[in-house]
Amino acid sequence: MLKIFTTQLTGIFSRIQDKESDAIEDGARLLAQAVISGHSIYLYGANELQGVFYEATESKEPFPSVKAFPENAEEVTESDRVLMFCSGTGTAEEQELAKELYEKGAGVVCVSPAAKDSAGIEQYCDVHIDSKLKMPLVPDEDGTRYGFPSLMTALYVYHALSFTLKEILQEYA
């Protein structure tokens, strides 16, 4: 089972690298605007994806200008940026939040699986990065699947954004 999980997860990471590199660069450029101008990057991740916030703030390589998403979205200004991580295509609440931020003019970078139709959260994002994780990775004998590593794929994209942002900021300095 571990071999299947590892193979499938490696495949997802490869697809993100191959197909989302432009979106990752666009997202990092949008986030760099907040860093360079002295504004905030608010990080949103519900449930298990709160782990991305802890990586961004408590690791040996903290993400610049990052803050926890506030209780009240009205605190986010149009000069701030928002980095949203969603394990699915966006709950109704997440889509409403993204829509509010998008309409306010705060730059929104969202990481989530792409929706099959246009009803996903990406419609309210300035930049959408497809996490490629649409279903659990390991098949069971009865046909069910398990092993849904949403935090692992979110952290992979987070680090890709972090590395790209660092390069952009070094070019700017």
UniProtKB/Swiss-Prot annotation:
Highest taxon of source: Bacteria
TM region positions: none
GO terms under biological process: carbohydrate derivative metabolic process
InterPro entries: DUF2529, SIS_dom_sf
Pfam families: DUF2529
Gene name tied to this protein: ywjG
Coiled coil region boundaries: none
Lineage: Bacteria, Bacillati, Bacillota, Bacilli, Bacillales
Protein name: Uncharacterized protein YwjG
Molecular function GO labels: carbohydrate derivative binding
